[in-house]
Structure formats: structure tokens, C-alpha cells
Amino acid sequence: VKSYTVVANKNIKIAKNIGNIISTNFYRTEYSNDVKGVEFSSAIKNIYSMIIVSGQGNNTSSALFRKSVEEMEYLIKFFKGKKETVYGLAGIGDLYVSAVGGRNSKMGEYLGKGFTFKQAKKKFMREDTIEGADLAFEIAPYVFKKISNKKVPLMIALLKAIIKNNKLKINY
């Protein structure tokens, strides 16, 4: 089984040198000079993976995946990253992995079934760290104040569900 990662540095030569040092036959690296885009993508995919899985079915989840990628592109550009980063390993690659398994996807499944965040955490995931929820608490005040609900409705819906402990309502 091979694993892949992205090494990001403003100086692409440094990123490639680091990648060459850590690459093996089973651990491959890609390179990027979009440090902001890579860092932000790797964080927000945790939120969007919960949204995707909340769809409770492949057809709905595929539509939520598409809309999530659209919102990620908007957010990456908003924070001065490169939109192409969203379409690479740090963006949709990492989003896919997070959506098909892991703690964020489990939480998304519970939210999609009608549990509030606190109910699901207490009943099913008491000992688990939910990175997307931790991030939601950190970024919600900024997102609510600075970013239009019309630009990122999925993100806003999940932030409200987690921060206000409401049932997740996605109007998409």
C-alpha cells in the first residue's frame, strides 16, 4: 500500500529537496509552493467531510462533495491560496480520504441521522477527537463575521450545528 503526502514551501526547490529525502517506494510526495492553500485545505477538509457524509446516501453525498469542493475553492482564494490546490492531493485527495472513513465522517453520519453534535459526541464518540468540530469552534466567529452565507452555505450550516448544538440543516 502506498501513501502520498504534499510538501509545501514558498520555495519549490526546498519542497522538492525535502520530498526527495522522505520519499520511499511506499511513501510518495507531491510538491507545492502554495503554503496557505495546502494548510487551509488540510484543515477545512475535516469540516467538509462531515458535511458530505451527512447526506445519508451516495447520490446526495456526491452532490454535497461537489458543492464542498466549490466552497473550498472559494475559501482558498479568499485566504490568498491558489485554487488549483483544491484539486490536488491536499484538497480533494485529502477530502476523499476523510469522507470515506475516520472520526469526522462518523460524526457527519450521526449529524445526518438527526443527532446534535453534543448528543453524538456523548453517546457514540465520547473519547474521540473530532478535528472538524475543534476547527469549527476556532473559526466560527471569523467565518460568521467575514464570509457571506451565500458563498459557503454548507460551511455555515455545519458551523451552526456544532457551535449552537442544533440539528444539522443543509438547504442544498
PLM feature spans:
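Short, surface-exposed connector motifs at secondary-structure boundaries
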Residues: 1-2, 154
